[in-house]
């Protein structure tokens, strides 16, 4: 199994879960945003970049690869708006070269880490896989374009793929040995936990007058270990000969910003001061994905779905690794 971007947050957790099932794992990562310390010791690591076809060819020629899990992409919404060409180059051009090499070496199964940002402003809540896709930023645009690359490559070359669309990955492995470590950090739960860790004095709440019960944005949070299991089930789905497919992943339950902060206060025992600030442009009031299709077809059943457990596992990582790896 080749895990591209396996030194990153979700990729490293998926690699670890694969190894726990007895799978032989090869990781390729350019370490632009990943961490060598996150690579499981039982995985074989290749440092390199998707843009380097010879690098990919070498892996496919020298390793027994029957499927690819693709996490190797830039994923910061704000950065993608400021520097869209960086995202088109890395996410699209890199994936095109990957597909060239896969087709050449007859590797016909890929599971792809997509995003619910492909939907843009949702028409319905919870969001279904059949809903309109109209991204509102270059990051979401590149992920949607990657899905279309897989679709047309499947038509032309027999590739089969699964695209997994999800929102807010969070939490950390129960061992506490790996977790979330972004620089700069942009995700809510790690930002909140920087307060009890002494890294910031308070957490900002962007907007308190949304059309939600407490006035703050509602989001769908999903434990990274549950996400990892979904990727493993998707590989199994393809290995069983099933056709290409797209699945949403989520708990189907949204939590507001205030609810997340309150739960973090309970878990950490810290007061975590919060400062109310104006809304940010483009933040929808509510984003929750329906994962009924994944539950029915993949047999996926998230088990770490309580907000308290998610934050407890994240805190277990962050309090012992305040500076990341």
Q: What do the predicted segments below correspond to?
A:
Residues 82-87, 178-182, 221:
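Short glycine-enriched, charge-decorated loop/helix-capping segments at active-site entrances
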Residues 124, 135-142, 181-188, 220-224:
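The catalytic Tyr-centered alpha-helix of NAD(P)H-dependent dehydrogenases
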Residues 174-185, 194:
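Hydrophobic, Gly/Ser/Ala-rich alpha-helical and linker tracts in large acyl-processing enzymes
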């Amino acid at each position: 199994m080749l895990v591209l971007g396996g030194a990153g947050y979700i990729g490293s957790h998926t690699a670890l879960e694969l190894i726990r099932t007895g799978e032989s794992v090869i990781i390729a990562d350019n370490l632009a945003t990943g961490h060598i310390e996150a690579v499981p010791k039982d995985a074989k690591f290749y440092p390199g970049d998707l843009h380097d076809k010879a690098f990919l060819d070498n892996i496919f020629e020298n390793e027994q690869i029957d499927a690819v899990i693709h996490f190797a992409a830039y994923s910061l919404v704000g950065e993608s708006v400021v520097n869209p060409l960086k995202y088109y180059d890395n996410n699209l051009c890199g994936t095109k070269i990957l597909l060239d090499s896969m087709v050449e070496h007859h590797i016909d199964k890929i599971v792809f880490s997509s995003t619910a940002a492909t939907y843009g402003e949702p028409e319905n809540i919870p969001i279904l896989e059949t809903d309109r896709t109209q991204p509102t930023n270059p990051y979401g645009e590149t992920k949607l374009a990657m899905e279309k690359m897989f679709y047309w490559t499947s038509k032309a070359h027999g590739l089969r793929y699964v695209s997994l669309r999800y929102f807010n990955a969070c939490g950390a492995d129960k061992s506490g040995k790996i977790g979330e470590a972004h620089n700069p950090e942009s995700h809510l739960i790690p930002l909140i936990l920087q307060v009890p860790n002494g890294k910031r004095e308070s957490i900002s709440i962007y907007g308190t007058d949304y059309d939600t019960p407490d006035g703050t944005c509602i989001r769908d949070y999903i434990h990274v270990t549950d996400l990892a299991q979904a990727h493993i089930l998707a590989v199994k789905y393809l290995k069983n000969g099933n056709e290409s497919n797209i699945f949403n992943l989520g708990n189907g339950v949204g939590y507001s910003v205030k609810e997340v902060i309150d739960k973090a206060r309970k878990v950490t025992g810290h007061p975590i001061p919060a400062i109310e600030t104006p809304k940010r442009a483009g933040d929808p009031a509510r984003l929750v994905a329906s994962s009924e299709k994944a539950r029915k077809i993949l047999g996926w059943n998230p088990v770490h779905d309580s907000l308290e457990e998610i934050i407890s596992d994240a805190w277990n990582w962050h309090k012992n690794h305040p500076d990341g790896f």
